[in-house]
């Protein structure tokens, strides 16, 4: 679809009381503005223009980074003077040379709008029969929204703001303005300069385009959202929480329909870019953030947080934090495991209780069951690491690697001082400090030999009592 989306994201968002741009606040781990940009891309818009103003540098850096590799052109245009929504659209048109095709203008704080809604909205002006359509909705409580009054011909007669409604209008006019507009690009470009600023705020308001277009004999109509939630915006932290709950419910209901079990769907937070395989069970307080892929027949949670992580099928992820990790099939993690970026758990491996792994590969069937730190390590298949074992990978300046061969056995409370090399089938005695390579099938022993002194303890206690008598 050769349509352009203009996303208005220049506002201060003062009611958020934040040091950051309003539309950068996250819902399920994803900035609001990214929700709406992604919706326009999925809808088939060929170009997306984000109008920025408040915190412009922060917004530009985010948009440029997030969409650097996007097949759809996503660009930022700065509105240096915040002179209203009409002025913001004019700035976008002039900066990008937009003069034809459908143009949809959306607010950057509408994270719940779907790609399907955007596509249908843009299509309303694609034939040229309508110069503009206004997105409308019928929320359960319309208070605060502008009300739509239609004429006998189905065109918009006027938009009546809440403060201007009579009691009868407030009771009978339940269709509300969602604040989004679709334009025929040629008509928009031809008449945008006719918007005036003769109002109390001396601003240029985009809704004035409706009367301007009607004055030129152009048809103006409405596009009604089937789901009113598509048109809900965020102006406060309270609304941010409310829309987060709606997004959560939508996503969880989708995955339940796809064969995923949620023990309590109100207590699981699944991001929009996550995917979950059928017959997986999601326990309470599970968070999937960013690009997370989970296979079939897994147990997720309780109390697990996965960020940009891939999980295979048949895994147990119990009270685990995993960031930028790859977890293959049949892996057991937790409780209270921490998988840091660069961790790769191969099939059937285990990271158990109070285990931290960073930038390491844990071989097929290998186990790190409890109370260990494994960093910058390549571990072969069939390895067992005893409790309290650590790879000492940092010398104060540089990180060093450890290599543990297949079928090695690392005794409890072992310190492997990197760079360390443990050969295939080697055994490292408990309590060892390993500073030299251990050959394959050898015993590595790096501790003082035990000495038993007969009678020493009894003599020691006797001397303590004698001291007390002095």
Please describe what each predicted stretch is.
Residues 57, 113-200:
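Conserved core of the sugar-phosphate nucleotidyltransferase
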Residues 20-26, 78, 195-198:
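Short glycine-enriched, charge-decorated loop/helix-capping segments at active-site entrances
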Residues 1-4, 31-123, 465-466:
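Conserved N-terminal catalytic core of the sugar/cofactor nucleotidyltransferase
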Residues 1-18:
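N-terminal nucleotide-binding beta1-loop-alpha1 segment
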Residues 261-445, 450-451:
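Structural signal for interior beta-strand "rungs" in well-ordered beta-sheet cores
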Residues 157-249, 253:
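Catalytic-core segments of class I nucleotidyltransferases/pyrophosphorylases
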Residues 45, 100, 129-132, 218:
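Short, high-confidence coil segments that cap the C-terminus of an alpha-helix
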Residues 9, 52, 107, 136-137:
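Short beta-strand/turn micro-motifs composed of small residues
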């Amino acid at each position: 679809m050769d349509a352009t989306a203009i996303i208005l994201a220049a506002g201060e968002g003062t009611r958020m009381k934040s040091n950051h741009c309003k539309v950068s606040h996250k819902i399920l781990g994803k900035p609001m503005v990214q929700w709406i940009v992604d919706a326009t891309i999925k809808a088939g818009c060929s170009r997306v223009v984000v109008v920025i103003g408040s915190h412009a540098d922060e917004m530009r850096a985010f948009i440029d980074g997030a969409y650097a590799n996007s097949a759809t052109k996503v660009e930022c245009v700065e509105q240096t003077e915040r002179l209203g929504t009409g002025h913001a659209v004019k700035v976008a048109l002039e900066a990008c040379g937009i003069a034809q095709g459908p143009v949809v203008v959306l607010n950057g704080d509408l994270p719940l709008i779907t790609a399907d809604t955007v596509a249908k909205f843009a299509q309303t002006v694609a034939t040229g029969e309508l110069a503009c359509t206004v997105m409308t909705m019928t929320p359960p409580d319309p208070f605060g929204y502008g009300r739509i009054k239609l004429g006998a011909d189905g065109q918009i007669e006027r938009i009546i703001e809440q403060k201007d409604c009579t009691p009868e209008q407030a009771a009978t006019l339940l269709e509300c303005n969602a604040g989004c507009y679709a334009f025929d690009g040629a008509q928009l470009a031809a008449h945008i300069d006719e918007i005036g600023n003769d109002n109390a705020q001396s601003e240029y308001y985009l809704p004035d385009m409706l009367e301007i277009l009607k004055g030129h004999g152009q048809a103006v109509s409405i596009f009604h959202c089937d789901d009113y939630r598509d048109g809900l915006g965020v102006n406060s932290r309270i609304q941010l929480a409310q829309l987060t709950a709606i997004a959560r419910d939508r996503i969880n209901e989708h995955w339940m329909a796809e064969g995923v079990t949620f023990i309590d769907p109100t207590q699981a937070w699944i991001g929009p870019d996550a995917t979950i395989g059928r017959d997986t069970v999601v326990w309470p307080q599970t968070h999937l953030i960013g690009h997370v892929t989970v296979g079939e027949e897994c147990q997720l949670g309780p109390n697990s947080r996965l960020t940009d992580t891939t999980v295979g099928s048949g895994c147990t992820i119990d009270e685990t934090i995993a960031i930028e990790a790859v977890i293959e099939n049949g892996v057991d993690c937790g409780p209270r495991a921490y998988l840091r970026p660069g961790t790769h758990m191969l099939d059937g491996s285990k990271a158990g209780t109070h285990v931290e792994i960073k930038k390491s590969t844990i071989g097929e069937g290998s186990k790190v069951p409890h109370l260990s730190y494994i960093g910058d390590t390549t571990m072969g298949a069939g390895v067992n690491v005893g409790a309290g074992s650590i790879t000492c990978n940092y010398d104060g300046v540089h990180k060093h690697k450890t290599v543990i061969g297949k079928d090695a056995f690392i005794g409890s409370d072992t310190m492997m001082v990197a760079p360390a090399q443990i050969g295939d089938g080697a055994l490292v005695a408990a309590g060892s400090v390993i500073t030299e390579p251990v050959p394959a099938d050898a015993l590595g022993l790096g501790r003082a030999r035990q000495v038993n002194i007969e009678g020493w303890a009894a003599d020691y206690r006797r001397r303590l009592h004698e001291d007390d008598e002095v």
